[in-house]
UniProtKB/Swiss-Prot annotation:
It is found in: Cell inner membrane. Part of the ABC transporter complex LolCDE involved in the translocation of mature outer membrane-directed lipoproteins, from the inner membrane to the periplasmic chaperone, LolA. Responsible for the formation of the LolA-lipoprotein complex in an ATP-dependent manner. Residues 6-224 form the ABC transporter domain. It holds the Pfam family ABC_tran. SUPFAM superfamilies: P-loop containing nucleoside triphosphate hydrolases (SSF52540). One of its GO terms (molecular function) is transmembrane transporter activity. This is Lipoprotein-releasing system ATP-binding protein LolD. It is an enzyme of class 7 (translocase). Disulfide bonds: none annotated. It is a peripheral membrane protein. Its EC number is 7.6.2.-.
Length: 224
């Protein structure tokens, strides 16, 4: 049976500040299975990014559960949660978040080094993946020397270098022109097939979203 690699049950999230009390998520249920490609669409402020942060273990829900590879995140301390997150998930954002003082190779190798891999193994794996995403001749360049599309390709390589089970992508092409966005999406689809990794993508682009296996819509903190 294809068990979920990432799941949330009855997920609620409230933000309270002074007299302000806003419930952003209202009992969200979601399962992501191995190799599945899901897109979530919705207006700004509908709760999409909040959901991704909770699924990624980057924030804690007000109530409900997040299960990562079958493990309840609430049962883990911060160190164990970070270890599980590093092993199970990859992250891609609208802005690449590559570190400007490091080369592209060093940026992509970093998750493996954080996970305890040797420098040689981390560099070899990063170089191989950078070649796969078309950046084999750019590995010693700094992020500032790359185009927007190249930086996002490097960010995708960084997300996949640990061979995660699922990649969470928040508007991964939102900062790119339409042609480059199409190329980046095509790359993600190819890597989904090659590595069997799941993709959960938040996007405003309907044409790109419909390349996924399933498109979900978020309205006022609920998946509909």
């Amino acid at each position: 049976m294809n068990e979920p690699v990432l799941e949330c049950r009855a997920l609620h999230k409230r933000f309270v500040q002074g007299i302000l009390d806003v419930e952003v998520l209202h009992g969200v249920d979601l399962r992501i299975r191995r190799g599945q490609r899901l897109a979530i669409m919705g207006a700004s402020g509908s709760g999409k990014s909040t959901l991704l942060h909770l699924l990624g273990g980057l924030d804690t829900p007000t109530s409900g559960k997040v299960l990562m590879d079958g493990i309840d995140l609430a049962a883990l301390n911060e160190r164990r949660r970070a270890e599980l997150r590093n092993k199970t998930l990859g992250f891609v954002y609208q802005f690449h978040h590559l570190l400007g003082e490091f080369t592209v190779l060093e940026n992509v190798a970093m998750p493996l080094l954080i996970g305890g891999a040797s420098v040689a193994r981390a560099r070899d794996a990063a170089a191989a993946l950078l070649r796969r995403v078309g950046l084999g001749k750019r590995i010693e360049h700094k992020p500032g020397e790359l185009s927007g599309g190249e930086r996002q390709r490097a960010a995708i390589a960084r997300a996949l270098v640990t061979r995660p089970k699922c990649v969470l992508a928040d508007e991964p092409t939102g900062n790119l022109d339409s042609k480059t966005a199409e190329q980046v999406y095509q790359l993600m689809l190819e890597l989904n097939q090659e590595f069997g990794v799941s993709f959960l993508i938040v996007t405003h682009d309907a044409s790109l979203a419909h390349k996924m296996d399933e498109v979900l819509h978020m309205e006022d903190g609920r998946l509909v």
